[in-house]
Amino acid sequence: MSRIRFGCQFYTWQMSGKRYIGKLPHISKVASSAGFSGIEPETCMLGPYYDDPAALKDVLTQYNLQVGAIALACNWSGPRETDAEKWEAERVLNYLKFFPDTHLVLSQLPGKDRSNLQQRQANAIACIEAIARRSTDLGIDCSFHPNSPAGSVFRIKEDYLVLLDRLDSRIVGFAPDAGHIAKGGMDVIEIFHTYRSLIRHIHFKDITTSREWAAMGAGIIDFPRIVTMMRDAHYDGWIMVEEESKEAEVNPDTATAKNGEYLRKSLLPLV
């Protein structure tokens, strides 16, 4: 049986720079008011709450939310984690012990270009799997989230074939982002359908035909079709909504409220 839940990914606010770092009560209030049931902050957005999990629990209780996932983004450019990268991974794994049902999302920071592509892909996979092994040992479910900037080593279909053929699905899942898939020139429905058995976490954001970020429902991605597909595949997990449009960068709260309207009208009736 499918149990799909919808939450807010913090990148909508992260685009504003340092303005919203640590503003968990504010973002949670906006997310809850918009009709979302969870949040997904990246570690860099937690601010003082990263040292005080009890305080985060209080915020979640106040706004009737769950922390559906926490995202960790690092370079992972070498054949193994650097000491600093391993420290960051251990920190988030220790933090997640306080939130036993929360998913860990791993996302690689893009480089300046795609030089030495095969080696960089192999290095990234090695680092991701090293973290995933430790995560699995702790009972923490995790997935890898590819992105689409020009310097990403997992951004086009050929990259996805490499990634999803090599990743050990016993310890790490696939966290597809509909917007990044489209921006990488791929068929979003095809990717979700082909790899649906590997999917443990999902990101939604919309994009136009000219590959400009857009509000939910204002672009080309057929979100209702994806939700229906994942429901029928008995997906039990989160779909985190974010927006990277210029409008969202200026006013993430308003963008989230509008995306909540789309959620209530077009997606919630499907699950």
Predicted regions and their residues:
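Structural motif corresponding to the early beta-alpha repeats
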Residues: 25, 37, 41-131, 136, ...
